[in-house]
Amino acid sequence: VTEEGKVGGDQFVLASGSWSAQLAKGLDVNLPLKPIKGQMCRLKLDDHFFDYTIHGMMTYIAPWKEGNGFVVGSTMEDKGFDSSIEGKVIDTLIERAAEILPCIKDASLIESWTGLRPAANDLMPIMGKSWRYKNLFYSSGHYRNGILQTPNQADYMVSIIKGLRKNEIPEFSPSRYNL
């Protein structure tokens, strides 16, 4: 049910990121999923540019798609649906990035933001057919790399829904949670 009324269909995919568990409650399904907050920022450096990602222990620095900018990320915080940006946390990210790449100390902060990543209890995606509802499929819990893997996830889900794949990947199957 939406603000515009009911939406009909033959098959449904529950793929609503960090909000999937809330929607699943409407089906009397306890989806073992919670949001994990990630804070990050974008910096600008006029004299330095690179086109690859640098990974540190707790931080990464990635080139921004436009200009001489970098994205610095990111945190993993179990704070529910809190999407506030915390200046001290952003400062810590920048300090960690400067330990990896000292020229970051001269960078200007352009913007900062948060994202809520859907994490299943075992940190593995929940993808496949529901055993409770014959026309329901799950595609959620992709956590930190979900957006990067979207094309592969879509191909996998299409193969499941169309019956082109005989077996689900057991580590991703909703059956591991009796869904």
Which residues are covered by each model-predicted region?
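Generic recognition of long tandem-repeat/solenoid scaffolds
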Residues: 1-2, 72, 139
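C-terminal catalytic lobe of FAD-dependent flavoproteins
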Residues: 101-179
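Short, ordered coil/turn segments that flank beta-strands lining enzyme active or ligand-binding pockets
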Residues: 3, 65, 152
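Active-site substrate-recognition segment that forms the wall
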Residues: 11-135
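Core beta-strand elements of the Rossmann-like FAD/NAD(P) dinucleotide-binding domain
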Residues: 2-11
